[in-house]
Amino acid sequence: MELQVKPKSKKWRGNFGLYFSLPILSWAFYDFANTIFSSNINTIFFPFFLQEQIGENAVLDQIASTFISYANAIASLFLVLFSPLFGVMIDRTGKMKKYIMIFTLISVVCTFLMGVFGGAPFDGKLLGIPTSLAIVILLFVIAKFFYHSSLVFYDTMMSDLGTKQQLPLISGFGVAVGYLGTLVGLSIYPFISKGSSHEAFIPTAILFLVFSLPLFFFLKESPKQQKAKQPFLSGYKEIKSTFKEMQSYRLVFTFMIAYFFLNDAIATTIGMMAVYAKTVVGFSSSGFILLYLVSTVSSIAGSFLFGYITQSKGPRLAVTYVGVLLLVALFIAVFAQTALWFWVAGSMFGISLGSMWVTSRTYIIELTPDEKRGQFFGLFAFSGKVSSIIGPLLYGTITLVFHDLGTLASRMALGSLIIMAVIGLGFLLKMKGLEEVN
């Protein structure tokens, strides 16, 4: 049975009824599912796996950091190339769930195969890298690309789930449910053998698939009028023309620039925090898992809190508050000499991470006209994913060039993200004047 998404025509009886309607709950469970992938693969076990395969001392740990950074950057590069087309596909076909399903299944299969090849005893090397390791890195790039591609369609789907007043709460609920997925994902950790992080890949793929099923089966999109078919490359031409309309959409583009730099700091930190905590601050694997759980609880609390802050103060101020919190968290992490200070930084980063998705998704919906929403979400992803190339490339290059300095190289790399956060905050402050003019 599929349920039509038409909450706008219903009178909700309080927030409980809003959150636990089957369409919205099914939508939120996909956040639950993809967060399992994000936390288990992107943040924890893939970095652990590379450190196990490459890192043997402080110098080689920096090389492992470079591999992690560059793999993330390559996945983001492909997303940059395709995300503008995805936005145009949404506007012209009106179909989102179809592509979410296809992209999710590809990501699930690649994640499963990471587990197969991660434990395979292959001999020989490919481009100077052990064959099994090279295959796992390639599969990670593909899995991450399709995971992020599905989110372009998923985020756009939110605009059909409620009224303008309800969207901040729906967004916050989705993010909070998503981070509960982290807790479920990490439940596999006690069953992973020491030094065998690849054992986490197959269970993660299964969990990702299982918790995606509610969206696949119980959520039906509202019918949308399809636009006339255009040549394949016309999508890029339309994106180019949209950039030329910058004067007409100054608020949108200014926010995308701000998001570019803030997301740079966030995306890079997500990919590197596990190795940084272990090699620089001295956390054990189990110690970092506990830290990540605390950070996740902070994300859940922050996403709910900032849903209400966004509703009461407006999304621009809410995003600004999140940016300041992120800046402070990065500063503490760079200069932390003890685990205690890194616990503080991790908790603050958790709040800012969950809250950034809540506030930014709501803000872009508020700023964009209905007929351009899919296209602007594509550009929104474009801005974020270009930054997801630059941040990891910068981080990985710093650790590569200065690897002889040991852990100081990682502190320098993380310190570069402070500059990005400051620039992003600067553009957010500029938006106050633009809002008054508009």
Regions found by a protein language model. Give the residues of each.
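Hydrophobic core of transmembrane alpha-helices in multi-pass small-molecule transporters
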Residues: 110-111, 117, 123-150, 341-355
